[in-house]
């Protein structure tokens, strides 16, 4: 099967098998350099998808909004969305809260995944948009959890 005939899930599986221990993504954080291997991205994607399905009871066709700067977890969230059958709604971090509210009111996401830098915005949107049943913080486990209504990546 050629590259053109493969879907995203097939490519994710193939790459995690073929390049398992090779570094797929890396970035500098305030805690130092952070790297994800291909198998690490695949594992994190599957864990997030499992969490979305088993804990948040998302259904195929539900929408997952992502508000975050570019980071390795962003890619894992997109893959998790595909694995769980959700529709990904990537949002530009430069949009105003009113622009975000307008977009999300229209697409009605059930979950918002957000980096810590945009946490306050996500909480505002959760209060304003009835379809949003959960906000998930994408940052590292050492990041402070702001309140009990916010979930964190597994």
Locate the predicted segments by residue:
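A short N-terminal helical cap/helix-turn-helix that marks the beginning
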Residues: 3-24
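Conserved AMP-binding/adenylate-forming core of the ANL superfamily
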Residues: 21-59, 65-71, 75-79, 96-101, ...
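Alpha-helix N-cap/start motif
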Residues: 60-61, 88
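Aromatic/hydrophobic pocket-lining residues that form π-stacking "cages" and hydrophobic walls in ligand
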Residues: 12, 77, 122
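Acyl-group handling in specialized metabolite and lipid biosynthesis
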Residues: 1-4, 34
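Structural core segment of the AMP-binding/adenylate-forming
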Residues: 83-154
